């Protein structure tokens, strides 16, 4: 078995979700240092488990400071795009800038905290860690998929996935947005503001007093 817990097979993860009561809960991120770059020895996933790629051609796209890559439908990439000026939803694909056309795109993975979302995030993390994707991964945003606390089995799975990316932000459920309220940092939880502040500093995203609303 690999020394990196997050590199265990997806089958093992599914077994744990199906029968969590048979196992003693453990925090498998103890003493685990999250990777900040692709890791030697990580095997590229099979083709069916890889994400598509979008080539970045226009200057407007190349100037994008942060790309939100939703790893499944409904992950929330377009919602986050509205909250951060200078960012863009990647359309569920790796944004790839041609060699010599500019620095590698900065990417934040986005997933919901249900089992399907966490499995998709794990696949994206493995693909990045293999070194096959020419992007700079900033981290992973885990958006709550429902109100309330995350079930224990999913919480353990989320910790497993978190061990394979540079940084993780966990954002709570926002009922007002679900009911149609404008997506705005002014009405967002503090965890959202902390995420945006970090990216503004790390990725040199301009600060704006203008909020973005759905069209």
Where are each of the predicted segments found?
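Flexible, charged surface loops at secondary-structure boundaries
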Residues: 1, 59-63, 99-104, 134-135, ...
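Extreme N-terminal, non-catalytic leader segments
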Residues: 1-65, 197-203, 207-213
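Glycine-rich phosphate-binding P-loop
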Residues: 64-88
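Inter-motif core of Ras-like GTPase G domains
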Residues: 92-113, 125-141
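Conserved Switch II/interswitch segment of TRAFAC-class P-loop GTPases
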Residues: 105-120, 146-150
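Conserved C-terminal guanine-recognition region of P-loop GTPase G domains, centered on the G4
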Residues: 122-165
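Beta-strand-loop-alpha "switch" segments that mediate conformational coupling across diverse proteins
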Residues: 157-185
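A cross-taxonomic marker for long C-terminal extensions/tails that follow the last structured domain
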Residues: 177-215
